[in-house]
Structure formats: C-alpha cells, structure tokens
Amino acid sequence: LRKGADTNTVWLQEVGPRDGLQNEAVILSPEVRADLIERLVDTGLSRIQIGSFVNPDRVPQMAGTDKVWKLLGKKAGVRYSVLVLNQRGVEQAIDQHVPYVEVFVSASETHSLKNSGARVVDALVTATQMIGSAVSNRMGVTAGVMCAFGCFYEGSVPVERVVEIVSALEAISPGEIGLADTTGMARPDDIKRVIESVGSLVGVDRLTIHLHDTRGLGIANLLAAVEL
C-alpha cells in the first residue's frame, strides 16, 4: 500500500505470488505461478511482487522465480518486482533484467538472525551494498524495514530504531521506503506513530506499508495509514 502525492490516490501492490505462496505446503510450478500472476494482472492490478530470489533450499516455494519471470507477458504499465535478501539475489535480478527489486532489513535482532542469519547492523551494511548494485544498474528499488511495528519474538520495537534504519537506507536509495508489519503486531496507534516519525524524515508520500490481518486489525491499520 502506498499513498500518492495526490492525497486522493492510493496504490495497492499484490504480494500474494510471494508472501502468500511461500507459506503454503503445496509447491506450485513456475508455469502455474506465472498463470496466477497473469490472472492478477487481468484484474487491473498495476503493481505485483512476482516472487523472490532466495535460497530454494530454505524457501522451496520460490524456486524457479527466474522461470516465472521469463514466462510473464510483461504488460505495459505494470510494475513487476522481486524481493531479494542478499547480493546473490540482486545479481539474479540483474541477470534476468527484472526492473524492480525490494530490499528489507529487520528492526528486530531475533527476527533478523532467524530470517537472514545476520544481526541488524550487519544486515544493514549488506542491504546498502545491495541497493547500490541495483541503483547502479538502473533498477527501481523499494528499501524498507521488516518488523517496523513490532516483533513476534521481541514484542515492541523502538520507533527510534526504525528511524535509524530508514535514515541509513534512504541515504543511498532514492525510491520508496517500505514499512512492514511482518508478524502482524501493529495496532492503529502504532501505524500512526511510526509513519509520522519516519514520514518526518523522508516524506509520507515516499512511504509504502505492508500489512497482515493476524489479529483482525488489518483494515483498521490500513485506514490509519491512509488517513495520514
């Protein structure tokens, strides 16, 4: 979700082909995944995260994302993106001529270690290198923060930590800045507090927000974000 500079415009991005499918026990073939994405495009969606370039041993549901990309029709006016977690993922995106990547750093030490095997400070260094590679190859980039509103493992996450990470990312990334409620911990007041703090640094019109409905607050959180 992103609110445009025109306050009457809200952009929605479909992430189901990545965030949805990676949690499913059934592993779909690249052909089926590509067909799903094409059907989503046919609904009128203009922003779709088609998958991720990650270790297939860790996330087998995302194996073959390169083939998914090759199978797609690449409709004009649609922004196709992939999530990348390391430099190898960026290099795959470059090799496959994917025009847009998303790079995220967790604000939670525990989540960062479990997700990437790195402490936040080290993950941030890696992320800035990844963004630099993408930008130098003229790719679009969304740089962002996972667990920006709280963490399943650690509970609340200091907003100062989120702002610190965003400050480092936006210094090298000229594009959108993402704030992800990765484990569905956010409440509307959390949404407002974090967006206001980060927005004062980078501008609210650059922010995107990724939400979950884990505790039945997804719509309330969305409305809180749109109102800002």
Give the location of each predicted region:
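N-terminal small/glycine-rich loop or linker at the start of catalytic domains
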Residues: 2-25, 102-115, 136-153, 198, ...
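Alpha-helix-loop-beta-strand connector modules within alpha/beta enzyme cores
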Residues: 58-82, 121-143, 164-169, 191-209
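Conserved anion-binding
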Residues: 107-182
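Catalytic alpha/beta core domains of metabolic enzymes, predominantly
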Residues: 182-228
